[in-house]
């Protein structure tokens, strides 16, 4: 999150970073803290879909409407993103291809190939109902 904030500092955006463990309830607590700020956010970008669902659940408890009052996005595009209401905007990660690539590298390492390399996999945004300006 720190590198992303540094990258967009020149855009004069008002960004606030909030850390949470991989827990919907802790994400809900982080969401509640963000809603106490003088300048409330218009969008919450969560590092994974589980945290985003925790934020949506907390918004509901606080009578904050998603997406009318705030947009919430996740990252992963796991099944829960299509089950939660409203459906969750997210970034699709090709988990199957990621696993295949990792297994292939492990097999090469086991065979003595120490030429570790970085593998880039394409992701894409999945626009859903949790965005205020959902197409």
Task: Label each region the model flagged.
Residues 1-135:
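Bacterial carbohydrate/catabolite-sensing allosteric modules
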């Amino acid at each position: 999150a720190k590198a992303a904030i540094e990258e967009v500092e020149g855009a004069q955006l008002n960004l606030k970073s909030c850390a949470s463990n991989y827990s919907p309830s802790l994400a809900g607590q982080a969401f509640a803290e963000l809603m106490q700020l003088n300048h409330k956010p218009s969008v919450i970008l969560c590092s994974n879909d589980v945290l985003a669902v925790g934020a949506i659940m907390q918004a509901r408890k606080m009578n904050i409407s998603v997406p009318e009052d705030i947009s919430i996005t996740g990252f992963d595009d796991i099944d829960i993103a299509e089950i939660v209401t409203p459906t969750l905007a997210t970034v699709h990660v090709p988990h199957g291809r990621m696993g295949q690539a990792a297994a292939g590298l492990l097999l090469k390492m086991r065979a003595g190939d120490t030429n570790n390399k970085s593998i880039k996999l394409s992701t894409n945004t999945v626009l859903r109902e949790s965005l205020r300006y959902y197409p």
